[in-house]
Amino acid sequence: MKRIIAFLICAAVLISTAAVCSFALSDEKIDGEVARTTETVREGVTCTHISLGSKSKFKLQEMWIVEFDPRDPLFDLQVTCGGKYTTKLATVENTVRNFKEANKDKGLVPVVAINGDIWTTSYAHARIEGSGTEYGGFSDPVVTHEMTLPRGLDIYNGEIVSSPHTLNETPYERQLHAFGITADGRTVLGTPSLKIYLNDLSIDGFEQVKLSGLNRLPAQNTIMIYSDKVGEDTAALDDAYEIVIDCDYDYVIKDGATIKGKVTAICKKGDENPKLQQNRLIVTARGSKNIQKVKNIGIGDDVEVSFEISGSKKDGDIWSQVTNCVGGHTILVKNGKAVANNDSDVIPATAIGNTADGHVMFLVCDGRRKDYSVGLKISDMPELCKKLGFENCFLVDGGGSSTLLKTTGEDTYEIVNVPSDKFDDGTYGRPRTVVNSIILSFIDENLLATPEPEPTAPEETQPAPAATSDQSGNKKGCGSSLTESPALCVTFAVAFAAALPSLIKRKKNTSE
């Protein structure tokens, strides 16, 4: 018996040690590598700094790679914005601080964060009426005021806040990609789409209308729908035909959702733009053919809007289970193979992806400084990311937006890299405001709000308490195996050792 107990203790310790120390970042030297250091940000999270010399095929670079296992039940990975609305820009640090304050009762303590999706700007796609802006050969106005939107499919803690950039949001450069994660820590990289349909339940034989997108620019020849997460109004031009739908409950837009409401107003050309508010949706049609499709819908009608995420057949149904998702630029590695591109732009870069064993890695590389770090040529990134150990990886965003933030204490953070934007005195490192951030948090169960116990009959035997979960569905304090949580492995080993005397004593009083 003693031998069995000793064996189990050793096994538990070995498992916990393996879980703590097993990381997937390749230790193979990169061409021209002159220095590499790794620090543990907290148990289960490493940050590796790699320096490449000027003779490297990838040029002079300073880069950082963060690695962790998203399946660890004590970790939580979310995509979020810095304010109440998705149109609010904020620095990564301010977003992290706002996130921590909003989630303190859930025990979420941010550990590291990076910048997220690319977004629409007033000097490009979101051309403001009367500004005279021209971009990519297009000069037609799109909005009445500034409208900053993520350009990819973005999901914040289970709620879809934007569908991907559409063909009519001019100019349409390319199909955008997205990286998603499920509640149990599985990841997916692909090119998902969001199908949206509007149906009028008050009209017999009404032919449901396929909508162009969710929380996108109110572009010409589209039918967009806007949720209460996007801002105070749709910023649509005067020629838009808008249908206001009010719901009598707190709706959440997610895959498979059908949201029902009542039409409370219709705003035509010459009318004032309707206002968005909690539990309200607004359908905005532009172009005569599109307006005709929704013109029979009247005030007082009961309507419903359905949402469905779809990816490629190879992805299966995983996109329907994604709880957090960020859009972005270019796929660099897919299923272990570097994906070649001919983009010669050289930029500071932020990338995200997964390793073959399911870990997630962030990559942030500085740039735009010939004496420090020049930045990565996008066409070189597939080879580099493959060498670093990515199984799947894509370029989220770059330029002055590239930011890596990590915790340095209970409520202190530091920017690890040196962003390429300058302060007023000309020095580099000024953090840029971005449309959203990707935040890895540690779940501190000591900070969880304690619910009031429900009264129970004294004669009933109560079942063992189930493992709790946060809003994104990530389990806390349980896992499918010991290796999923280093903390649990250590706890198991310590508890087992503490119980040894009683186990041995009990053994003496029982038969073989």
Predicted stretch roles:
Residues 24-284:
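Zymogen propeptides
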Residues 479-491:
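Juxtamembrane/start-of-transmembrane alpha-helix segments at the extracytoplasmic/lumenal side
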Residues 445-481:
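C-terminal low-complexity, Ser/Thr- and acidic/Pro-rich disordered "stalk" regions positioned immediately N-terminal
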